[in-house]
A protein has these predicted regions:
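Short-chain dehydrogenase/reductase
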Residues: 115-116, 136-141
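A structural signal for short, well-ordered beta-strand elements
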Residues: 61, 113-116
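Local beta-strand N-terminus motif with an aromatic residue
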Residues: 24-25, 107, 120
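Glycine/proline-rich active-site loop of Rossmann-fold NAD(P)-dependent oxidoreductases
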Residues: 129-134
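Glycine-rich phosphate-binding loop and adjacent beta-alpha segment
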Residues: 35-106, 139-150
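Adenosine-nucleotide cofactor-binding segment
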Residues: 1-36, 90-93
Length: 150
């Protein structure tokens, strides 16, 4: 979470550049939009791809065409459900591949919070206040969620 106390985004671009030896990311998966998209445009590698998944920030980003041209990057809209409806065969192949990667432990969601259902109001409050990074899990029937097990 790179949100600063004043609500602005800071450090995201610098962290990506640091992790990539100054080159920038080859692919950025952006479900947030807004400031994250703006920063992503500035830390994407030459020829990279930004996958726009959604706008949970509440602000639709505007893509600066000059950066797209200069860096020769691609900004790609990704709607998994629609992709599967338009091309069911390819959609199933993609879904099967995601399941395979998850089963092999190569991808897993980051879960920052887990709550029993009795505390679901607290979970919703954290989501509303943007205090959750990744996912928040609500469990039922006394199930103990182990964040390390996924």
């Amino acid at each position: 979470n790179y949100t600063q106390p004043d609500g602005t985004l800071g450090g995201f671009r610098e962290e990506v550049k640091s992790l990539t030896a100054g080159l920038g990311a080859d692919v950025i998966y952006d479900p947030v939009g807004g400031d994250v998209f703006d920063e992503s445009m500035r830390c994407i590698n030459w020829g990279g791809r930004i996958l726009t998944i959604g706008f949970t920030s509440g602000r639709w980003p505007l893509a600066p065409v000059n950066l797209i041209l200069i860096k020769q990057i691609s900004v790609i809209g990704v709607r998994a459900g629609e992709y599967g409806r338009q091309d069911p065969v390819k959609g199933k192949e993609n879904t099967d591949e995601i399941y395979r990667l998850a089963e092999e432990g190569l991808i897993s969601p980051y879960v920052s919070h887990a709550f029993p259902i009795e505390r679901s109001v607290e979970a919703m409050r954290l989501l509303e206040n943007r205090e959750v990074i990744g996912k928040a899990v609500v469990t039922m029937n006394g199930y103990e969620f182990d964040k390390e097990s996924i």
